[in-house]
């Protein structure tokens, strides 16, 4: 799916792609989606998605931490029936979630921009061998500044 977007970003139709990329719909994946709708949902799922309904409908308004999930929503990685549950997915862009390390997910955003830390991970053969490396970001902007 990412390759479909990559082809648009590096192709001659970039300007048209960017004009049509923004929006919150569609918000439910369907393999039959085509054109701008298909590209938009791929971009949104890969860059903006935090919560969804248990049925998989994506929510693009909520930014709370997973512990403060709005009623009726679950973090995308805890959605029932998630097909990638057996695959490790490393992700960021959710600073209110913070560091999270499970066999199937690795949340790396520890809020550097907001005065937290810049995180990286060194992978080992097992979950116990994952090494979390972080550097504080004291020069960062605080929310609301």
Mark where each language-model region is.
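Feature recognizes metal-dependent phosphohydrolase scaffolds
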Residues: 1-145
